Amino acid sequence: MHQDTVRATAFAMPLTSPAYPVGPYRFRNREYLIITYRTDPKKLRSLVPEPLELSEPLVKFEFIRMPDSTGFGNYTESGQVIPVTFRGRKGSYTHCMFLNDHPPIAGGRELWGFPKKLATPTLRTETDTLVGTLDYGPVRVATATMGYKHEAADLSAVRSSLAEPNFLLKIIPHVDGTPRICELVEYHLEDVDLRGAWAGPASLNLWSHALAPVAELPVLEVVSAMHIVADLTLALGKVVHDYLPKSEPRDLKGRSHAFAE
């Protein structure tokens, strides 16, 4: 294969059969269970990268069911999202995500910088209760419950929240283990068709796990819960802050990730 062909066809790996297709990435009947809770402010500050800023010690634990997504298929994900501000604009920073489908893991990490790991989240309705669970291997690390459609939510407020910017810390290493890319990425949800949104009573329990440390942001108080169903497009992102300025060498001196023999 000629190198011009490589350049012309390069999108994702493997070159001849990428793990995920070119977008746009449209999601239909995307269902959210979002529980907002109060946590330890000192611990939260230690996990949110500058120049993002915190206003309140809040975390949103999300379970998202995606039965119909372009190129990514039918899957579920879960994770922690932190309300932040960036240059005076309110938004959300994605701290961690866990899902059960390889294409959105690969695409999410490589394109946007989503902090995705392989795990087993679920979101389902059990009689009168919306139930979200997250297992890492055989170990349960999160369980959420919410009364099913107890109260209609303010749709205009929900639309406004879905329109806010979202932020990711994208990290791609160089072949020697030093950071090749270390950027703050902003992305938005577009063409949102909000099908419904509801509030209700909720609970959230987290358990410690070495590789899925969601419990390091403990639940001190459940503040609110939201159940949302929408169609939307996940737009591509843009870089809003570079942690490795162009004036600095990308192979940072004094730092090594050489493998031990």
Curated annotation (Swiss-Prot):
InterPro entries: Acetoacetate_decarboxylase, Acetoacetate_decarboxylase_bac, ADC_dom_sf. The keyword Lyase applies. The active site is at K116 (schiff-base intermediate with acetoacetate). The keyword Transmembrane does not apply. It catalyses: acetoacetate + H(+) = acetone + CO2. GO terms for molecular function: acetoacetate decarboxylase activity. It is an enzyme of class 4 (lyase). It holds the Pfam family ADC. Keywords: Decarboxylase, Lyase, Schiff base. Its EC number is 4.1.1.4. Gene3D superfamilies: Acetoacetate decarboxylase-like. Belongs to the ADC family. Catalyzes the conversion of acetoacetate to acetone and carbon dioxide. This is Acetoacetate decarboxylase 2. The gene is adc2.
